């Protein structure tokens, strides 16, 4: 009998996303704020992404740090986000945080919901 260890695939936090988080945190004047990314049921494809700023970090949260700011994900959401990339984009549709998720089999046109 063999035992295999499992290391979860990291969640990528791009420089562009980290820079935007830093800008927003600096504007608020609260360096305890972290960007929390989560997955909930809903949207046109079954699951949807959410973003919020949070001062609290739970013991079992995954934390990704870059440029002095933190991205936080709860364990339930992380199972859907392992290997994904959190980025920030500016375009004709406006500015927003986006997730490029290799686990998603389909995504909606706006990119905020997905299915696995």
Curated annotation (Swiss-Prot):
GO terms for biological process: iron-sulfur cluster assembly. Binds 1 iron-sulfur cluster per subunit. Iron-sulfur cluster binds at residues 44, 108, 110. One of its GO terms (cellular component) is cytosol. SUPFAM superfamilies: HesB-like domain. Belongs to the HesB/IscA family. Required for insertion of 4Fe-4S clusters for at least IspG. Homodimer. This is Iron-sulfur cluster insertion protein ErpA. The gene is erpA.
